[in-house]
C-alpha cells in the first residue's frame, strides 16, 4: 500500500461520515414525514451538500501523484472533508431529537449562519489545495474555476448574513446549477 492509498482511507472515512449523516437525515425525514414540516430550500441544500461530498471524494484522487507526503500537508488536506462533515451535522437536528416534531424551515434558519460560514471556508481551502497540487494544475482549471470560486464565496457569505427568504430560495437553486455546470466542465474526468 502506497502513501496515497494509506492516507486516502481517513479522507474517505470522513467524507463517508458526512454522506452517512446526509443519507440518515433523509431517512429520518422520510420515516417521520407526518411529524416533520419539510422546507424545500433545506431539501435543495441537502442535495447540494451531498453532491459536494461526492465531488470532494472524486477530486481527492488528483492527489495520487503527490510525493513526498508530510504530516502538515496531510493535516491541510483533512480540512476540506472535515468542513463538509461538520456542515452535514448542521443540516439536520440531532438524532436524539428525531422523535419530536421538526420544522425544517425553523431548523434551517436557526443554523444557516454556521452552515454557510463553514461552507464558505471550503472555497479558500480549495484554492490553496489546488495551488498545492502545482501551478500548472491550478492554471489548468481555467477561468471557470476562478469565477466560480468568487461566486461561491460571495454567495455563501451572503447566505450566512441574511435571513431573506427570497435570497435563500434563489441561492439554493443557483448553487445547485452552478455546481452541476462547474462539475461537468472541470471535474468531469477522474484524472
Where is each model-derived feature located?
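Alpha-helical transmembrane-segment detector that highlights a single hydrophobic TM helix
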Residues: 61-89
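Hydrophobic transmembrane alpha-helical segments in integral membrane proteins
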Residues: 1-18, 187
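A generic, lipid-embedded transmembrane alpha helix
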Residues: 40-63
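Membrane-proximal helix-loop-helix units in multi-pass membrane proteins
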Residues: 81-147
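Membrane-interface helix-boundary motifs at transmembrane edges
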Residues: 28-41, 64-69, 97-108, 160-171
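Alpha-helical transmembrane segments of polytopic membrane proteins
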Residues: 12, 71-82, 141-152
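Central hydrophobic cores of alpha-helical transmembrane segments
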Residues: 44, 168-180
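Juxtamembrane boundary at the C-terminal end of a transmembrane helix
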Residues: 133, 182-191
Amino acid at each position: 500500500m502506497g502513501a496515497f492509498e494509506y492516507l486516502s482511507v481517513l479522507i474517505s472515512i470522513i467524507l463517508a461520515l458526512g454522506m452517512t449523516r446526509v443519507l440518515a437525515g433523509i431517512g429520518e425525514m422520510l420515516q417521520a414525514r407526518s411529524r416533520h414540516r419539510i422546507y424545500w430550500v433545506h431539501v435543495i441544500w441537502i442535495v447540494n451538500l451531498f453532491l459536494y461530498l461526492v465531488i470532494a471524494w472524486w477530486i481527492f484522487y488528483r492527489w495520487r501523484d503527490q510525493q513526498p507526503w508530510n504530516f502538515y500537508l496531510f493535516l491541510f488536506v483533512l480540512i476540506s472533508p472535515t468542513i463538509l462533515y461538520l456542515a452535514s451535522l448542521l443540516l439536520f437536528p440531532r438524532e436524539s431529537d428525531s422523535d419530536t416534531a421538526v420544522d425544517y424551515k425553523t431548523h434551517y434558519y436557526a443554523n444557516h449562519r454556521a452552515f454557510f460560514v463553514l461552507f464558505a471556508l471550503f472555497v479558500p481551502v480549495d484554492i490553496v489545495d489546488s495551488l498545492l497540487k502545482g501551478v500548472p494544475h491550478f492554471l489548468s482549471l481555467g477561468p471557470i474555476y476562478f469565477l466560480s470560486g468568487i461566486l461561491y464565496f460571495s454567495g455563501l457569505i451572503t447566505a450566512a448574513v441574511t435571513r431573506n427568504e427570497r435570497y435563500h430560495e434563489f441561492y439554493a437553486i443557483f448553487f445547485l446549477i452552478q455546481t452541476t455546470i462547474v462539475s461537468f466542465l472541470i471535474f468531469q474526468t477522474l484524472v
